[in-house]
Structure formats: structure tokens, C-alpha cells
């Protein structure tokens, strides 16, 4: 008797886009195989399916290839979402936050985290402060009202935004902790300590495929 093939996720542990995809698949209760790539030696099979060469890439059992993290999240919750994670993320406020996260905030985050790539090490504070203004301050204001972006319980937007806030906070942890953004800091701490995050961040053997059971 042959086992039913599972979706195959090409991933990279620390990539925030891959992180959001892994968490969505886990929340949706979807078992999947994960292949943690080696950045300097990307799998030929992945490049044949997705020549852009970035992760995440999800290959479905029928051969369909999803190359964008938000498409993977949407697909996962369209399979199983009794708690309404995806539906509750469709509010105007959440859509606006997500657009800023993946647009203006990510632009500034890259320049803050990797100033040497942009020949602007001396002016690192400028993109840092712009990132706070673009996303973190509005995010804190929204979290003050409910605690999660889905209201009293989280939604897809929480999982989509969290990995990028985590990345920002890790650049200068002491400075981030000093910001007057208590709701955001509590929200981030909660997700960092969440069993979902622990499962999604399990260290996998590089270049090998490991099965994630339905969570």
C-alpha cells in the first residue's frame, strides 16, 4: 500500500517569508515535507520548478507550484480553517498593515539590517526610524485595542507580519526594548514563546527533506 504524497515545501529556516508559510501550514493542520535549502547550493529540482530561486516554494501533490508566501498561506487555510484565520485577516486595517509590511517596512528593514549592502552604514538610524513610523507604531496602536490583529484571537496577518517584526527587533534588541510600544513588544514576546513558533523553527538537516506532521 502506497502512502499519499504530501505537499513539499522548499524552505530556509531563518527566512521570514518561509517562516510565515511554515506556520500557516501548521495552523491549518496540513502535514508536509520540508526541504531546508542550502543557499549557496540550491536544489536543482527546486530551480527547475521555480527559476526565481527564492523560498518558500510549495509543490502540491498534483504538481501545482506556489511561489509566493501569501499564496501558500491562502492555500493552506482554504484547505482547513475552522477558526477563520484567513477570513479575519481580510479587514481593511489588516490588509493595509500587510501591504506596508511587505512594502515600505521591508524596504527600510533591509537597509537597517544590512546597511553595508547599501553603502550607508553611517546612516543606519534613518531606515530604522522610518520603519518604526511606517509599521511598528501603527501596529502597536492596533494591538492596544485587541492584543492580536484578528481581535481577541490571532489571524493570518499576525503570522504574516510577526517574522519581520522579529527580524527588526533582533538587530538592536536593547534599543527595540526601549521603544514606547508596549503592546507590540508584548505581542512579539508572546509569539516568540508560542509552541507554534517553536515547532516551525525546528532545526532541520540542511539539504535534506523532513516531514512535519499535522500540528
Spans of model-derived segments:
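Short, conserved loop/turn and helix-capping segments at secondary-structure boundaries
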Residues: 40, 52, 178-185
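Acidic, serine/threonine/proline-rich low-complexity intrinsically disordered regions
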Residues: 123-124, 173-179
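Acidic/histidine-enriched, glycine/proline-rich intrinsically disordered or flexible terminal extensions
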Residues: 204-215
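Surface-exposed helix-capping loop/turn segments at secondary-structure junctions
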Residues: 141-152, 196-200
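C-terminal end-helix/capping segment
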Residues: 180-197
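Catalytic cores of nucleotide-enabled group-transfer and carboxylate-activating enzymes in metabolic
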Residues: 35, 43, 138-144, 162-169, ...
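GST superfamily/GST-like fold recognition
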Residues: 149-174, 183
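GST-like domain detector, emphasizing the conserved glutathione-binding G-site
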Residues: 1-134, 140, 146
